[in-house]
Amino acid sequence: MKLFGTDGVRGKAGEKLSAQTAMRLAMAAGIYFRKYSATNVILVGKDTRKSGYMIETAIVAGLTAVGYNVLQIGPMPTPAIAFLTENMRCDAGIMISASHNPYYDNGIKFFDNCGDKIEENIEAEIEKIYYDDEMIANAQKTMTEIGANKRIDDVIGRYIVQIKNSFPKELTLKNLRVVLDVANGAAYKVAPTVFSELGADVIVINDEPNGSNINQSCGALHPEELANEVKRLRADIGFAFDGDADRLVVVDENGEVVHGDAVLGVLATYLNEKKALKGGAVVATVMSNAALEDYLKSHKIKLLRANVGDKYVLEMMKENGINFGGEQSGHVIFNDYAKTGDGLVTSMQVVAMMLKKGKKASEIFKAIKPYPQILLNLKITEKKPLEKIAGLKELEKNLEKDGIRSLFRYSGTENVIRLLLEGKNQNLVEKRMNEVEKFFIKALNA
């Protein structure tokens, strides 16, 4: 059985992701990282899911069993793990989170000693070790060689300093009222602290995690409550994070949710104006709206498209010497400040841009009006290779003739196919989506 998906290992806690699986996976990872070990220390963090305790304990057991020392830092955002792994000179970092998924799911993500998400070839090596009984048995230490673990609570300060350093020193948030929806997740302490220390008038919602309310009708996937609060409190802006705070959704002062591609496009031109956009280009994904491409083109900025997943965006950024990119879902990567999508870094750049321009959020983001786009997540029973689905090529050709861009892809973590249609005529896009949905229901026993 394949362990790794598009973003680490993920599944229902206690089922696909059991304590046994987590412990053995940690042992396999420990065996792999040992080959390049400099400090013999691995950092482990988590979000606020109840199952995080079980998985964390299992991971610590697995790592110490193969001789690794472990630093446990408790609930922290995924980008904090990436930063702290390098900052504290650890051999690797492990984040226990299923990101935006419901509380009953959990996941394990690995970072190398530079704070980068591990590449697919490394995942394959760890997976190979995982299934090698002899290697696992031989790697287990005894007596004095067994590793130790240490729980530390004060590293949050290092990450807060890093986030504040991404905000221009000459600016202050003193006259800004900000509403934060921390999704009962990993940002519940750090996000309010950063904004308060920079002088903002901060109102926080969904900041009482109980182990099972992470992402529950709140945060980046459900910004409705945030939108209402921003309007009610007459705030200047609202920010919604997801469970592990690697993505961000922006709500303007009118309570309107800003399209993710509008956030990307406007931030790109802001960086370009500051002469801080490297490579004269931005990396987005195949899901990004064509309106983003047209907007960037009008500002003489190129758009490159990567596969869906922030690690693929980052790969393409590195290959092309680009320092800015992201996904319309809210993963935005400022490579000068972070190694992965970081909701807090993004929020800092958004408020800095507002202050520098002296404009309201709604005025800034109205520059990009996305073309009508429909994304449908269809539950399926089988993942048949797309190239083997009869009639699909013909369907795609017909959509192209209608001036409709289409993208069909399976989720890497769920039994779902994502159907995307985009065009300039809303009614036509809706009509064609009905036909596409019926086609896939029949083809994939949905």
From Swiss-Prot:
Phosphoserine occurs at S99
Q: How is it modified after translation?
A: Activated by phosphorylation.
State the Pfam families in the record.
Answer: PGM_PMM_I (PF02878), PGM_PMM_II (PF02879), PGM_PMM_III (PF02880), PGM_PMM_IV (PF00408)
Q: Name one GO cellular component term.
A: cytosol
**Molecular function via GO:** magnesium ion binding; phosphoglucosamine mutase activity; phosphomannomutase activity
Reactions the enzyme catalyzes: alpha-D-glucosamine 1-phosphate = D-glucosamine 6-phosphate
Question: According to its UniProt record, which residues of this chain constitute the active site?
Answer: S99 (phosphoserine intermediate)
Name the job this protein performs.
Catalyzes the conversion of glucosamine-6-phosphate to glucosamine-1-phosphate.
Q: What class of enzyme is it?
A: isomerase
- CDD domains the record matches: GlmM (cd05802)
Which superkingdom does the taxonomy of this entry point to? Answer: Bacteria
> What keywords were assigned to this record?
Isomerase, Magnesium, Metal-binding, Phosphoprotein
- Comment on bound cofactor: Binds 1 Mg(2+) ion per subunit.
Q: Under which EC number(s) is this enzyme classified?
A: 5.4.2.10
Q: Where does Mg(2+) bind?
A: S99, D242, D244, D246
**Name this protein carries in UniProt:** Phosphoglucosamine mutase
BP term (GO), one = UDP-N-acetylglucosamine biosynthetic process
